[in-house]
């Protein structure tokens, strides 16, 4: 954040929200270069010292303006007339420049909002993706229905650019950005353009996509606030609108005449919304009628305001006590715990049944097996196989790689209610490691274990993750000398969420 502020001070003489002049500033690309790997894309093709070149950027922009798009034939659609022979190199140069530029105007707003909220010290904990689950444990036990929604992707990059236009007023900059995306779409098929663009230029795509999500969420929050604070009559009118800012007077008359007795059912203060990446969850306590209303408005909002088609099957409404929903690699549902309490009053005895709710969060075993099979650690049935690609490494490096994967998975899934599936995953990784070592030494698994010692080899796979546990629990173990307390029992009974996890594990399948 401080590095960006320095460069913002140097660009003060430019008019606010005018980004086009910054394209030709060398420090913009130097900033992008400093945050990347030394094998950066900002290099001269025939240079001596592998540094980025502002001259290349200027040449590419000049070529973009000089290109005549009317003479491009359909037979040459696979060839890129602008980018030439080194199209990937040139394309990423411009894309990184655009990514840096569109981020600059919003960084001061982000820093000021964080300072006003006074959450700088705990910002890392707020950023943790596992901070969602304590919220679910506190709120979802009182709810009954959940709507699992997958946010649709924009069908064209132009939609993302149009959303950004509401925030940044610079005609020249957006003209160049559209010209750049137009040249990009000429040599990429239309159906694959958005996916190819997101893979080759994740920084620029994520920025544009986050603005798309932010825009739709701002409208959703407006709906949510109105549903809580408006009177019932206004609230009912608001819910019957398809186009949110039109046709209000007519709907007032319709609702006042036909639906005056059903107005109280529309109010739902216990509605909760959670989103991560391209998936969101909407939970409510009332009957699923209100959830259906919200889903209809989501679909109309995406289709009418963003021109994005959403398939109906991407939105599912389920009862929490009967169905589970998938979020961040976990399967979660609300489990009903029934217990019988005996009560005695004078000479009469009563049996009272108490039903309590508990959020059950478990490790999805089958999706993990699919991820391990895709990574070539086992087959589709879960049988461990060797990893011949790693056979060229030393024994220590092979063991360290498997241990790192195992520890990361245990660290990520430590908040699970039951850890039996996690122990089976550790067993698969252990046997895959042994088979990889046996393949390297050109021996069988049995002969390799007899030679190395099966008891001492890879014992870290079955040790408890006490080094991962917080230091508070370790101190508690040292202070408590009673045999009734055990860290292992505490670990099995309670869930522990780590707030240092900022990204999903590579093997986590959250489809």
Swiss-Prot record:
Which HAMAP family does UniProt cross-reference here?
A: MatK
Which Pfam families is this protein grouped with? Intron_maturas2, MatK_N
Give the Gene Ontology MF terms in alphabetical order.
RNA binding
Role noted for this protein = Usually encoded in the trnK tRNA gene intron. Probably assists in splicing its own and other chloroplast group II introns.
Which key words are in the record?
A: Chloroplast, mRNA processing, Plastid, RNA-binding, tRNA processing
Q: What subcellular locations does the record give?
A: Plastid, Chloroplast
Q: Tell me, in one coarse class, where this protein mainly resides.
A: plastid
Q: Name one GO biological process term.
A: tRNA processing
Gene from which the chain derives? matK
Put simply, this protein is called Maturase K
Family statement: Belongs to the intron maturase 2 family. MatK subfamily.
**Natural source organism:** Trifolium burchellianum
Q: Which GO terms describe its cellular component?
A: chloroplast
Q: Which InterPro entries match?
A: Domain_X, Maturase_MatK, Maturase_MatK_N
């Amino acid at each position: 954040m401080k590095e960006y502020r320095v460069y913002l001070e140097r660009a003060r003489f430019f008019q606010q929200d005018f980004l086009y002049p910054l394209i030709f500033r060398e420090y913009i690309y130097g900033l992008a270069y400093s945050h990347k790997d030394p094998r950066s894309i900002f290099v001269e093709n025939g240079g001596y010292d592998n540094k980025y070149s502002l001259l290349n950027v200027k040449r590419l922009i000049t070529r973009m303006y000089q290109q005549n798009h009317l003479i491009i034939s359909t037979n040459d659609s696979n060839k890129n007339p602008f980018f030439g022979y080194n199209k990937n190199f040139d394309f990423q140069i411009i894309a990184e420049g655009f990514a840096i530029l569109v981020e600059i105007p919003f960084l001061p707003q982000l820093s000021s909002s964080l300072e006003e909220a006074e959450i700088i010290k705990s910002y890392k904990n707020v950023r943790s993706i596992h901070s969602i689950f304590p919220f679910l444990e506190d709120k979802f036990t009182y709810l009954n229905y959940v709507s699992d929604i997958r946010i649709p992707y924009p069908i064209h990059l132009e939609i993302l650019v149009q959303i950004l236009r509401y925030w940044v007023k610079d005609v020249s900059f957006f003209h160049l950005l559209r010209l750049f995306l137009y040249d990009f779409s000429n040599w990429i098929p239309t159906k694959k353009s958005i996916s190819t663009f997101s893979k080759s230029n994740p920084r620029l795509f994520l920025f544009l996509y986050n603005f798309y999500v932010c825009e739709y969420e701002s409208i959703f929050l407006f709906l949510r606030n109105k549903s809580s604070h408006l009177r019932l009559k206004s609230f009912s009118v608001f819910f019957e609108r398809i186009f949110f800012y039109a046709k209000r007077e007519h709907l007032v008359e319709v609702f006042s005449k036909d639906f005056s007795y059903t107005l109280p059912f529309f109010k739902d203060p216990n509605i909760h919304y959670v989103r991560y990446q391209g998936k969101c969850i909407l939970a409510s306590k009332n009957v699923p009628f209100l959830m259906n209303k919200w889903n209809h408005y989501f679909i109309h909002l995406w289709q009418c305001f963003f021109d994005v088609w959403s398939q109906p099957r991407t939105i599912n409404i389920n009862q929490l006590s009967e169905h589970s929903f998938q979020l961040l690699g976990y399967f979660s549902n609300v489990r009903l715990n029934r217990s019988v309490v005996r009560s005695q009053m004078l000479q009469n005895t009563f049996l009272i049944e108490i039903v309590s709710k508990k959020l059950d969060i478990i490790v999805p075993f089958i999706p993990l097996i699919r991820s391990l099979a895709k990574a070539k650690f086992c087959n589709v049935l879960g049988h461990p196989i060797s990893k011949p690609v790693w056979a060229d490494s030393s024994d220590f490096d092979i063991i360290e790689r498997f241990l790192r994967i195992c520890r990361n998975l245990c660290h990520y899934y430590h908040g699970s209610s039951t850890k039996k599936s996690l122990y089976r995953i550790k067993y698969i990784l252990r046997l895959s490691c042994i088979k990889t070592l046996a393949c390297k030494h050109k021996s069988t698994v049995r002969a390799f274990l007899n030679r190395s010692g099966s008891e001492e080899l890879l014992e870290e796979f079955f040790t408890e993750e006490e080094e991962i546990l917080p230091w508070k629990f370790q101190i508690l173990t040292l202070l408590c000398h009673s045999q009734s307390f055990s860290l292992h029992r505490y670990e099995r009974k309670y869930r522990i969420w780590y707030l240092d996890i900022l990204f999903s594990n590579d093997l986590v399948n959250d489809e």
